[in-house]
Amino acid sequence: MIRLLHMLGWLTLLLGLLLQIWLKDHDARWAVFFYAMPKPCLLGLSVWLTCWPKLGRSQRMPACLASLCLAFWWLSTSWCMSERASIPTKNALNDEPLTILYWNLCRPNGLDQEMVDLVKQTQPDLAVFVEAGNAGSLLAKYSESLPDYRTELMPRDILRLSRLKTASNHSVLVPRMATYAQFDLAGRGPDFPVIVADIFPHMFHSRKPQIDSVFAQTLRRPDAIVIGDFNTPLESVHLAQFRKHFTEAFEAAGFGLKETWPCGMPLLSIDHIWVGSEWEVLAADKFWRLTGSDHAALLVTLQRKSKTR
């Protein structure tokens, strides 16, 4: 029985490596296994195989080498250590930095005090939250707690707090297995679009149609900003269009592991902020508030690039 478990452990490790290196989530039939076996889980499995009882040194060596290779591979692809740009002083309106806070609140039962405290701490220009729960009946309390912000609950529990003027509000579209909302903001040069996405996970459906649907809302505009819970790790092949036309903010200017879920464990990077080429990412931070949500919150500081650069 012990030998059988040891063999199953190795087979699982080899399957996970095959998924991470080659198969990925091209096909929905095996995508769930790709999502379930990220590099940190494979590293944990290889360490477990290294510590397997009643094995000699030579028998442990393959698992030990696999652990070292996986640790290097994971850290080299997940650890962000970008040099932050200096945040400029406020001069012309175009030069003012734009600070955005995003967080999946995981449907709180009442007023989310953790969220209120984080907004007060970070003072963003725009804060957006998905899975805001029954926030509609609490808008007055949120407005009272955060009087500097215009508070609005959009359909499908997307909550927006903004210090910027909303130039236009587009209808919320709800394609199969996903929700997203789009609105234009004014106050940092020309009006620019913001798309907030919440893609639902499903074991037997590919996430590509939903990701492509969200991408289509950007119209490939270089000033677009896309925020949300993609329920899809940054290693996914379905994010190729985003990688071609946009920059992921934490990868560009963050420090630390880019994974945002679950509960402080760096397993999957499913919460993203994508910015178009007209934006420079000055800083990106990640906050864990484990009593408030099993997702990390993301805070980014952007600035429009000068046309003369």
Say what each PLM segment does.
Residues M1-A92:
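N-terminal membrane-anchoring alpha-helices
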Residues L65-L118, N169-V172:
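N-terminal signal-anchor transmembrane helix
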